[in-house]
Regions:
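N-terminal localization/anchoring segments of enzymes in phospholipid and broader phosphate metabolism
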Residues: 1-291
């Protein structure tokens, strides 16, 4: 066990001996993931062949840069998401610019819209997005939303997923909270992903809530960033989203959402951590870069 874990247990054991010892004995083992999480993890393993190159050398896009190639190899092996490319990239220095561009791209959707966010909160930002989603769903666009139950708790009604379903938006509340002693409740999705037609993808640190675009100021002026990529890299974001959506529809054929598009001239390593496994891919990669 790593040093951080040991130190975290040392404090309650030393200062609250009876209680700390009992907690340690009961919780020291990593909890088995709930059945639904385990099923999705297994599905993810089975889906790897859809988007990982089979030659075993996924870092060839970074010929001449051994370090970048080794990073790409590690990410592909750990996540099943290969290095890819895009033909357009845009950086958003604020939530306001991110919001404006996201709304523009959502209006262009013709096939499908996938959204996965930690926080949904009714207000100017989310209401503007939702208006588009409902209209697009009425036009026949496949609209799907995943939000985290803990992240959105006390921000949306308990039955919010059902409410969105009635409005034509397919919705899944990830890992609903249950008031029991269950460490699987810590398995949350903090990802912020928007995917349009399998070509355009957004990500970053911005949730669908007004404080992120400074319409409200519960924590002062909010500064966060986001990006948009257009091209084959969007398929990696489709894979990320669908790994979680499998919880809702395990028998659906997802391969139609993972088709490749035109090759771009900009290399892109699009990957994520997952609430479904015990790998800390992002942390490991940062440490690899630092050291």
């Amino acid at each position: 066990r790593n040093a951080e874990t040991k130190m975290a247990w040392l404090m309650p054991v030393l200062f609250l001996p009876p209680i700390g010892a009992l907690l340690y004995l009961n919780l020291r083992r990593r909890p088995r993931p709930r059945r639904r999480l385990k099923q999705l993890a297994e599905k993810f393993a089975g889906m790897e062949c859809l988007y990982v190159k089979k030659d075993g050398h996924v870092g060839t896009e970074y010929a001449g840069d051994g370090f970048a190639a080794s990073c790409a190899e590690y990410v592909a092996q750990a996540t099943g998401l290969p290095p890819t490319d895009c033909y357009e990239f845009e950086y958003f220095p604020s939530g306001e610019s991110y919001c404006e561009r996201l709304l523009e791209e959502l209006e262009k959707a013709e096939k499908y819209i996938f959204l996965e966010y930690f926080i949904l909160r009714p207000g100017k930002f989310w209401n503007s997005v939702l208006d588009i989603l409902k209209r697009k769903a009425g036009e026949g666009v496949d609209v799907r939303v995943i939000y985290d139950d803990i992240g959105s708790m006390l921000k949306v009604p308990d039955n919010y997923a059902a409410e969105l379903e009635k409005q034509g938006v397919k919705c899944m509340c990830f890992n609903p909270f249950r008031p029991v002693l269950d460490l699987a409740q810590n398995n949350r999705t903090h990802r912020k992903i928007a995917l349009i037609d399998g070509v355009t993808a957004f990500t970053g640190g911005i949730n669908l809530s007004d404080e992120y675009i400074n319409e409200t100021h519960p924590f002062g002026h909010w500064k966060d960033t986001g990006i948009m990529v257009r091209g084959r890299a969007a398929q990696n974001f489709a894979a990320m989203f669908l790994q979680l959506w499998f919880l809702r529809a395990p028998d659906e054929d997802y391969t139609r959402y993972l088709s490749t598009g035109p090759k771009g001239d900009c290399s892109c390593l699009a990957f994520c951590d997952s609430p479904l496994d015990r790998q800390n891919v992002c942390e490991d990669l940062y440490l690899k870069i630092i050291y």
